[in-house]
UniProtKB/Swiss-Prot annotation:
Name of the protein described by the UniProt record: N-acetylmuramic acid 6-phosphate etherase
Pfam families to which the protein is assigned, alphabetical: GKRP-like_C, GKRP_SIS_N
Organism of this sequence: Cronobacter sakazakii (strain ATCC BAA-894) (Enterobacter sakazakii)
Active-site positions on this chain: E83, E114
Subunit-structure text: Homodimer.
UniProt EC number: 4.2.1.126
Coiled-coil zones: none
Gene this chain is encoded by: murQ
Function: Specifically catalyzes the cleavage of the D-lactyl ether substituent of MurNAc 6-phosphate, producing GlcNAc 6-phosphate and D-lactate. Together with AnmK, is also required for the utilization of anhydro-N-acetylmuramic acid (anhMurNAc) either imported from the medium or derived from its own cell wall murein, and thus plays a role in cell wall recycling.
Swiss-Prot/TrEMBL catalytic activity: N-acetyl-D-muramate 6-phosphate + H2O = N-acetyl-D-glucosamine 6-phosphate + (R)-lactate
């Protein structure tokens, strides 16, 4: 396998003098390269949309959204998964991040783990993967055996699958139903895919998880109304969301939130409809948690 032929491994002609540049000019070069990321991701939006719809469908049928990757890619998946419970109020374990080598690999590289295709399958078996789930494989190179092994196993079970890589026509793209390949070009630091490639993957993960949660009723307007108010900052945000969605004062927002144990969706519904807390919860349940639908007469 000629890894040197991968776009992500080639040398960038615009940064050949990186080690001779003054600090500010070096940072300008980094910044110019970073500007390419958003455009590269924009070219993949039709495929990202398919992944969002597939993820939302998996969550709606009681399945999970599972990310898997090695190194930087794996860490990005774990990061995105860990943000979903506080942001969208989903239970831990609904969005899962797997990294080659296990949790210890988040802090220290586990040598050889990414080269083991069987390990990818084994990690999915260990969490009880089933056909209701969706698996998203991440690898900047697009050829990580751990991810390929996992995707092949997931497809054999009938899971929805997507692959995110930064090299076109990659093996993981071929292993998944949905291929998302933002080609960001050579890195400023040759082969350091934690730079543009990592940023592109994070952009895509942000869209997949956020988009899926919007489609699952976790958002009203552009407010994260299923957020868990677990600290002072988030309690304040809950108050502001109720105020912004309904026009009430802070005191009124706080009063209604105390009746819902600081759950924002029923609080908004109570203010806008006059329902009590119990009835607001019941109406939300009848509309599968979609606040906009619950507000319709």
């Amino acid at each position: 396998m000629n890894l040197g032929s991968l776009v992500s491994e080639t040398r960038n002609p615009d940064t050949l003098d990186l080690d001779a540049l003054p600090t500010l000019e070096m940072l300008r070069r980094f910044n110019e390269e970073d500007k390419r990321v958003a455009y590269a991701v924009s070219e993949t939006l039709p495929e990202v949309a398919k992944a969002v719809d597939a993820a939302a469908a998996a969550l709606t049928r009681g399945g999970r959204l599972i990310y898997m990757g090695a190194g930087t890619s794996g860490r990005l998946g774990v990061l995105d998964a860990s943000e979903c419970p506080p942001t969208f109020g989903v239970p831990h374990g609904v969005v899962v991040g797997l990294i080659a080598g296990g949790p210890g690999a988040l802090l220290k590289a586990v040598e050889g783990a990414e080269d083991n295709a069987q390990l990818g399958e084994d990690d999915l078996k260990a969490i009880g993967l089933n056909a209701r789930d969706m698996v998203v494989g991440l690898a900047a190179s697009g050829r990580t055996p751990y991810v390929i092994g996992g995707l092949k196993y997931a497809r054999a079970l009938g899971c929805a699958t997507a692959a995110i890589s930064c090299n076109p026509g990659s093996p993981i793209a071929e292993a998944a139903e949905i291929a998302i390949s933002p080609v960001v070009g050579p890195e400023a630091l040759t082969g350091s895919t934690r730079l543009k490639s990592g940023t592109a993957q994070k952009f895509v993960l942000n869209m997949i998880s956020t988009g899926a949660m919007v489609k699952c009723g976790k958002v009203y307007q552009n407010l994260m109304v299923d957020m868990k108010a677990t600290n002072v900052k988030l309690v304040d945000r809950a108050c502001r969301m109720v105020m912004e969605a309904t026009g009430v004062t802070r005191e009124e927002a706080e009063a209604v939130l105390t009746q819902t144990e600081y759950e924002v969706k029923p609080a908004i519904l109570m203010v806008l409809t006059g329902l009590d807390a119990q009835a607001a919860h019941a109406r939300l349940a009848a509309h599968n948690g979609f606040l906009r639908a619950a507000l319709q007469p």
